[in-house]
């Protein structure tokens, strides 16, 4: 590297300044992560070069053996990470090292918790790992040249981690990037061979290309034999983890590899490593994360597996091998049946990709099934983070609908904790004799529906009801019509029929009571008018005076709220007003001769039923007026 030319000073993007302050002043607990991040970046640079060289072999120049080298200088107090990967042009150095994509930065800064260990774990996940260099360094130099550019088009980027950075054009014969860290006075212990080797073994043993350090020679006898020329030796295994036999891989190695590909520093909950031979040949290594990424629900979030073809890296985020509802699964797939020049367009469809997607989806679901069976507490953690995403499955994946349904968890009247811990198989195992339906109720929260009037007859008969309180649940039930041959029934919808759970005598008695109350039903309907579709005697109620039932083909409250929140037009629906003929309030209403008072009481019962269902009132002021009037009459 020779004379510098065209030197310029640039100011960091505002968000980078904030990030640098965090690195310099806040992350004390796990400083060695800087090495993990810089090695990971160097490995990515090698992957990118391999991929580009498939169509442009000249990019490899005279240096086809990709590697990473780590050096240290005790006297100068420096650590150097050198790779011969893709490298950067001057413009790329300014763009990549001076700014961060706005969306990622904003989310990163919002996600910071103040907990040093948690915040340190977020660094790689948000693609800002380079700046971790400033945890241990007060000055960082980067020398780089992009593959394909001339030696005279190298770039030197330099910063002290303050408000700005310098770039200059330099001569750099070697392709790739060399990062030099000038260590802070109190961090100079990192410039030790043993420290660096042990840290590299800990975090980067799984990296699929050699990480080399100079051989160190100790003692006077060895010094005599010390070779004149520097000897480099690999300090990692340097083989793609997924290509090794499962029996040779320790759990710790699987865990570290997960952290490398996911940039998530928590251990995964489970993994599945499989080699498929026969008509199709591929190897897959799939992981279930412990926690959800910050952008799990972002439409354009990164998702998909790392794709390799015959061990050559092709692309990150190959979305085509798993359905969208399994987007949280991390891992790699290495195929022998795809061509090396495969593109995203080619991957959109085709028999090979479709077959792999089917098999990998089943593999991922099997992994979740095993987790639920063998480690229920871990599955609870999974469900808390990814349950709502998995609920997209029945709509998206018809062939695996039953399998996905078996993995779903709900709250129910069986467990008063309100935790979503009940599997559909558990529910079926507890069904009453003669019960052939799966009963459920949707609502905004467990607290809102646990004492709902809709549950009264079920509590009386000891029938368990699933309580569905996620915003997605009513939408889910539009696609999940049955499980294990048994139909789902929304207990707030239509004219409730308990089938064999009601005796013939009970049914006959209900019909006779309904006939005796036809006149009252007509009076209430005349009062409520167009606000209701129908008024009838209820078979649901034992304690409450009235309830609003949803029409068979109408949208429920959850779906209406979901559509309203997204700005869509919601079709108008009219509920069915059901009343409990044996309730004292209904008996008083039936005996009321004053039509104004009858109208006020009917309206109060209607509004209260709407509130009990979790709905809001169209005219709350009039409800309060009527209620106050009634209270005054009662207190007179």
UniProtKB/Swiss-Prot annotation:
Gene3D superfamilies reported for this sequence: 3.30.230.80, 3.40.50.11260, Heat shock protein 90, C-terminal domain, Histidine kinase-like ATPase, C-terminal domain
Cross-referenced Pfam families: HATPase_c_3, HSP90
Region (A): 1-344
Keywords: ATP-binding, Chaperone, Cytoplasm, Nucleotide-binding, Stress response
A single cellular component GO annotation: cytoplasm
Function field: Molecular chaperone. Has ATPase activity.
This protein's name: Chaperone protein HtpG
Origin species: Xylella fastidiosa (strain Temecula1 / ATCC 700964)
């Amino acid at each position: 590297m020779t004379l510098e030319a065209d030197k310029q000073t640039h100011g960091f993007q505002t968000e980078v300044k904030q990030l640098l302050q965090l690195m310099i002043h806040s992350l004390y607990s796990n400083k060695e992560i800087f090495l993990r991040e810089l090695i990971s970046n160097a490995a990515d640079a090698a992957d990118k070069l391999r991929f580009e060289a498939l169509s442009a072999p000249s990019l490899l120049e005279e240096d086809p053996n990709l590697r990473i080298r780590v050096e240290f200088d005790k006297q100068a107090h420096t650590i150097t990470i050198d790779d011969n990967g893709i490298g950067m042009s001057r413009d790329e150095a300014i763009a990549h090292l001076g700014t961060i994509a706005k969306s990622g930065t904003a989310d990163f800064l919002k996600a910071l918790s103040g907990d040093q260990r948690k915040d340190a774990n977020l660094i790689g996940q948000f693609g800002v790992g380079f700046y971790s260099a400033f945890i241990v360094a007060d000055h960082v130099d980067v020398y780089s040249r992009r593959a394909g550019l001339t030696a005279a088009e190298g770039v030197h980027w330099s910063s002290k981690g303050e408000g700005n950075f310098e770039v200059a054009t330099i001569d750099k014969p070697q392709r790739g990037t060399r990062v030099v860290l000038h260590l802070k006075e109190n961090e100079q212990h990192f410039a030790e061979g043993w420290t660096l080797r042990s840290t590299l073994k800990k975090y980067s043993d799984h990296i699929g290309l050699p990480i080399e350090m100079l051989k160190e020679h100790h003692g006077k006898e060895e010094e005599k034999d010390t070779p004149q020329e520097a000897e480099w030796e690999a300090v990692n295994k340097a083989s793609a983890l997924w290509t090794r036999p499962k029996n040779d891989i320790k759990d710790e190695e699987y865990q570290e590899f997960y952290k490398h590909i996911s940039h998530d520093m928590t251990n995964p909950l489970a993994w599945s490593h499989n080699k498929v031979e026969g008509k199709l040949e591929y190897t897959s290594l799939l992981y279930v994360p412990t926690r959800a990424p910050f952008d799990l629900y972002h439409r354009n979030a990164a998702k998909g597996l790392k794709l390799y073809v015959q061990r050559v890296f092709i692309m990150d985020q190959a979305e085509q091998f798993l359905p969208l509802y399994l987007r949280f699964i991390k891992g790699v797939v290495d195929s022998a049946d795809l061509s090396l020049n495969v593109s995203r367009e080619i991957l959109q469809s085709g028999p090979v990709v479709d077959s792999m997607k089917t098999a990998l989806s089943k593999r991922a679901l099997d992994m979740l099934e095993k987790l639920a069976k063998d480690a229920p507490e871990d599955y609870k953690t999974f469900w808390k983070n990814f349950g709502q995403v998995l609920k997209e499955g029945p709509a998206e994946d018809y062939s695996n609908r039953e399998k996905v349904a078996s993995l779903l968890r709900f709250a129910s009247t069986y467990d008063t904790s309100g935790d979503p811990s009940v599997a559909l198989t558990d529910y079926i195992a507890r069904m009453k004799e003669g019960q052939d339906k799966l009963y459920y109720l949707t609502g905004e929260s467990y607290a809102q529906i646990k004492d709902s009037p809709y549950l009264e007859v079920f509590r009386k008969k000891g029938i368990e009801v699933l309580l569905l309180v996620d915003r997605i649940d009513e939408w889910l039930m539009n696609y999940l019509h049955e499980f294990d041959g048994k139909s789902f029934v929304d207990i707030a919808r239509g004219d409730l029929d308990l089938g064999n759970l009601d005796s013939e005598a009970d049914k006959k008695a209900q019909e006779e009571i309904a006939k005796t109350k036809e006149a009252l039903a007509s009076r209430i309907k005349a009062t409520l008018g167009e606000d209701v579709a129908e008024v009838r005697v209820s078979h649901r109620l034992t304690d409450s005076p009235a309830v609003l039932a949803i029409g068979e083909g109408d949208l429920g409250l959850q779906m209406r709220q979901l559509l309203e929140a997204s700005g869509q037009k919601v079709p108008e629906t009219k509920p069915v007003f059901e009343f409990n003929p044996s309730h004292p309030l209904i008996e008083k209403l039936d005996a009321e001769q004053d039509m104004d008072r009858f109208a006020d009481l009917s309206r109060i019962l209607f509004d209260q039923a709407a509130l009990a269902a979790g709905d809001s009132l169209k005219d709350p002021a009039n409800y309060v007026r009527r209620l106050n009037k009634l209270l005054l009459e009662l207190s007179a």
